[in-house]
Amino acid sequence: MKEQIYRYVDAADYILCRYGPLSFPSWEDFLARNSRKLYAGKLRRAIPQAATHLGITPFFGSTRNLHHDVTEPFPIPDCSVEAFQSEDVFEHIDLSKMVSLFNEIHRVLAPGGLFRLSLPDYHSDQNLQRCQRGPRGEIVFDPAGGGKLVDGRVIEGGHVWFPKIEIVRDLFNESLFATHGTIKYVQYTNADGTFKLDPIDYSLGYIQRTPDHDARVADRPRPISIVVDAFKS
């Protein structure tokens, strides 16, 4: 019931922002906030970050969301953000853009600031069992990620790459976090099925798709997401 109410409120907020009398927050509004925390994608009132963060999305405006494409540079100064979180968003963005995006997040984070990243884990049995594969056994489409597979390409907003810990490590190793930061790989599955499942400090940013909150892996706790905490030095 509460979730349904939140959806109605979010929808009303969008209409009132688009047609008046409310307005979308600006980057100047963000910089004037006491708490400068960003959340990639649409920020809904049903999640705890609605009280602490502003979302970044070009698709859905509201009083809690900045109208901006996260792959474009952020029009704010260096070292002006306390924390940046992305949960199940970056797999919808072309893999070739990841390192530059990580570096832009590093630029705007204040020293000691946190980049919390969570992505679907494609070594996880829960995620693998639903995927379509190509002739060499490679994952080509995840129907749960949205979009369509057309002529070998995922279109219309689906997962355009399929995160595994080996890929994510390489991305961070190529980013500024490797040379000017600390990277903690908190939860992930290895190719051989072994995994790391360290406790998550949810006070730093709630994550839904973990054994603590996701019923699919609650009976036999194991990673369903790759969770990384990267701190700027």
State each model region's role.
Residues 95-104, 108-110, 114-231:
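S-adenosyl-L-methionine-dependent methyltransferase catalytic module, highlighting the catalytic core
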